[in-house]
Amino acid sequence: MSKKRVHEIAKELKSHGIELDNKEVVTELSSLGYDVKSHSSSLDDDQATAAVQKILDKRKPKQATPPVTAKGFVVRRKVGPPAGATADSGAEASQAAEPAYEPPSAPEPATFAAEEPVQAPPPVEAPRAPVEAPSAPEPQRVEAPVAAATEPTAPAAVTSTPPAQVAEATKAPAAAEVASPPPAAEAPQAPVEAPRAAVPAPAAAQPRPSVQESTTLPQPPPRSPVPPAVRTPSSTSSSATVVSRGPAPGYQQRGGPGGGRPGGPGGPGGRPGGPGGPGGRPGGPGGPGGRPGGPGGPGGRPGGPGGRPSYQGPGSYQGAGRPGQGPVRPTSAPGTGVQASASASPIPQGPTIMVGGVPHAQVSPTGTARPTATQAVVISRPLIQVRRVTPTAGQAKQYPMAPGRTGIPERREYKVVPDHLGRGRELVDVSKNKERGQRKRTSGDTQSVSKQELTDMVWGRVTIPIRGKKRKPTKKGAKTQITQMAEEKKVIKLQEGISVSDLGQRMGVRSAELIKKLMGLGKMATANQLVDADTAEMIAGDYGWKIDRVGFEVEDYLPEVETRPEDERPRPPVVAIMGHVDHGKTSLLDAIRKASVAQGEAGGITQHIGAYSITTARGDVTFLDTPGHEAFTSMRARGADVTDIVVLVVASDDGVMPQTVEAIKHAKAAEVPIVVAINKMDLPTANLDRVKKDLATHELVPEEWGGDTIMVPVSAKTKENLELLLENLALQAEVLELASNPLRPSVGAIIEAKLDRGRGPVATVLVQEGTLKLGDAVVTGSHYGRVRAMTNSRGEQVKEVKPGYCAEVVGLSGVPGAGDAINVVADEKAAKQIAEHRNMKERQTELSKVSRESLEQLFAKTKAGGGPKELRVVIKADVQGSAEAVKQAVQKLSTHKVKVEVVHSGVGAITEGDVMRAAASKGVVLGFNVNPESGAEAAAKAQEVVLKSYSIIYELIDGVRTEMEGLLEPIRTERKLGRAEVRNTFNVPRLGTIAGAAVLDGVMKRGAIVRLMRENKQLFSGKMASLRRFKDDVKEVAQGFECGIGIESFNDLKPGDIIEAYEIVETRQSLT
């Protein structure tokens, strides 16, 4: 179901003439009970429509609903004019009335007789019409001044039109206009034979021009006039209502136009047909007791036998009804109608209603009715659908509605609301009914309507009869049908592994159930723990699922390169300088570069990998300076992996050291040729032969000894044989025939990476293949980005880097790991996909390492005293390589007593977040070549977190070892101080019992821990409360002196007791 917002409701109100802004509309809706907060709040379509209608009803005056009349047609006729009426008054009355239908043509008007109001009018002379008395089964004749044939409708009562409405009465189709006052008409006299010989002939009517005359029947009781009522077709009455009255003085009929509806034959007790107009229907024969048919006009209806002849005289009109309404009943003119019997008694009660020839009811007028009053007669027939005639707004006053519950159906108001299932609509009765109140329609009355019909219903407040959709009956309480997934669709695609919760979500199985399955397989797992593809396939098979292993191939996203020899170009060699710490590696490089990098290193040792490109007489050479400390093992290994030649620097006075051996192993593992530079040849303690001998033990045999290892004795201080070293490097590069394709997408290696405060992540990249250019999309490890800027080793901004050269690259999403490969891809989108895949694999690997302890392991740890202590550290370093080296060095310090756990290691300054991370894990923060931020120091003091920064690697290691020893419980030992014998006891108020003792040996110190011995048994151990000599408080009393000793919480002292004094000494445990 669609929704409408408040501002849309305001626009809709504006289209209806209600000017309200959004705030006012929100206020109005809130007052109506709708939950709206602002102009962007929304309501359902039905609620919005109902709310608009309520606001319109409140803001706009409600228009009167046009009255709905009963279905059928109304027959109206004019009675004689009132006494004293003049032609002018008749004309004014005729002009004042609004005709419901204008006849096509009107013959000359007939004249009306008018008398003075003070004089009694003479009797009206009615045409004589003898009525024969037929036999019992034959129809009888009923004398009436006027005969009219109408189509039967629902039976209705007859009422006289009030005088106030006479001027607004509608003219009959053939109403005559008043031309001149004619002479007084004679009273009609017509003998009437009672139908079925049961009704006596009425007497002559009294000369009352305003009172109607009709046949009288003694059977029906008189009743007061009631307004005409419309009865439904299902009424049990099946006869028509006949109204008869005497003719007005001087009233004449005139022939109507042709085309009128023909009259039907009169039934038993029915009304005879009237005179037919040109082209009208011929009159049918009168039934028993009915009125005779009138003479037919040209093409009109002939009079039937046995009935009362209808009159056709001058000025009489044949029935020509309004379109779609049937013929208008004819009226009689003076001298041409049926005369009333002179012996007929006057009937002051009013007209008699005949139903099927039998008197149905008698109307007793309460006042004098005007002869020109219009009377409505509603005739009905059972089981015939009638048409409802609804007058316009202007005609509502002229045609009053028939009252009564059966005449006008009850109006109900309904509200359209969603049904209880939310799939359809239903109508709720909101009519004001005190008896029933609001009632909800049953499901059988539920109807589906269109949006336009709903809108019309709400705006017009009317019920639209619509047909609802047929729905199949459903059984209550039927269970929901669950559709089973096809077997070919029950496939889960995996790359490496999947978490338990994700696997359960894909199969539609609860995670707790899968955990039970894993426990049955002997694996303890949590909902977020990853399981490998094999385990997932085993579990999924139990539920009818299959595992499809789909590997993520990075090669699919990397550009394909065709290697062609003609595209290869020579490139400069990459040389890594390796060796033991303090053997002069950086000094030798400074001598070659003619710079002084070693002076800038903290502690005079190299703790980073430095990449430098140097131009020599033999060409360009790229040097990588690696650290020699044992903590930087990974750096040396990384340097050996990306280099072409390794220069092993060995001090001539120290010879081969542990890191020298390690460097030899890294170079051999990388299958890189080694050139040995024996440094410090300027020292008097230099021993070249010893160094060569030591190297030969590690399979590095010099060329002069028949080997293939180039050894050059050099001196970084005196720059001895530096040119010879460079020449040998060039020769070795020519032997290797180093070449690469500069046209292919670039491939390189991350030598070092750091987080610069101004530039962000900065990576030192060694380009191995292709040309790295500005704007290239790159991916390295789990990070990606676009090359924003590049700086060479001399600090110059460059736009491209050729193979064999180094540069600092800015633009990565994070600090990459040292040693990671860097690749140029087609676009940044592909780089992001590769990085996200690698990040997911790293996360899966980390989660798979986390395992829950079994109950046996937990009991064993508790029994062993909780297991080894743990030192949790947070490491921050200036570059990624240093952070990795520090992490490895710290983890190597773990022993069986204390285990070091690295909570986090990163690059950059120490932040407040690092301090909070350490506080949460109850650890320490270690910084290497970085300083803490201002907020970090304050947070460390507030959280009581140890924060230490170091610039030299071995100082950091010593500090960590000290922290580890501090976690161990100290060793507590007793150190004996002295002994004293109790000679006497004294009771001192507020101090208790004081022992007068003599010091036997050692020293008695105040505050020491004492042990009371009695007969070589310990009675009490506590703290010495006081120590006095005479009246003075003293700190200690030596051997051979007497003193007073008080013991806390102990007064049971006796002479001869021995008091031993001692103290607890704590010593720190060692990590071993």
From Swiss-Prot:
InterPro entries: EF-G-like_DII, EFTu-like_2, IF2_II, IF2_N, P-loop_NTPase, Small_GTP-bd, T_Tr_GTP-bd_dom, TF_IF2_bacterial-like
The keyword Cytoplasm belongs to this UniProt entry's keyword annotation: yes
Compositional bias of kind Gly residues: 253-307
Any Pfam family: IF2_N
Compositional bias ranges of the Pro residues kind: 218-230
Keyword DNA damage among UniProt keywords: no
Residue span of region Disordered: 55-369, 426-452
Residue ranges of the region described as G2: 604-608
Compositionally biased region (Basic and acidic residues): 426-436
Domain of life where this protein originates: Bacteria
Region (G1): 579-586
Sorted UniProt keywords: Cytoplasm, GTP-binding, Initiation factor, Nucleotide-binding, Protein biosynthesis
Binding sites annotated in the UniProt record for GTP: 579-586, 625-629, 679-682
GO CC, one annotated term: cytosol
Region (G5): 715-717
All copies of domain tr-type G, residue ranges: 570-737
Recorded GO MF terms: GTP binding; GTPase activity; translation initiation factor activity
Database matches in Gene3D superfamilies: 1.10.10.2480, P-loop containing nucleotide triphosphate hydrolases, Translation factors, Translation initiation factor IF- 2, domain 3
Region feature (G3): 625-628
Ranges of Low complexity composition bias in the record: 91-100, 108-118, 126-179, 186-212, 231-245
Chain segments carrying region G4: 679-682
HAMAP family: IF_2_B (MF_00100_B)
UniProt record similarity statement: Belongs to the TRAFAC class translation factor GTPase superfamily. Classic translation factor GTPase family. IF-2 subfamily.
Purpose of the protein: One of the essential components for the initiation of protein synthesis. Protects formylmethionyl-tRNA from spontaneous hydrolysis and promotes its binding to the 30S ribosomal subunits. Also involved in the hydrolysis of GTP during the formation of the 70S ribosomal complex.
PANTHER family: TR-TYPE G DOMAIN-CONTAINING PROTEIN (PTHR43381:SF5), TRANSLATION INITIATION FACTOR IF-2-RELATED (PTHR43381)
UniProt protein name: Translation initiation factor IF-2
Species of provenance: Myxococcus xanthus (strain DK1622)
UniProt gene name: infB
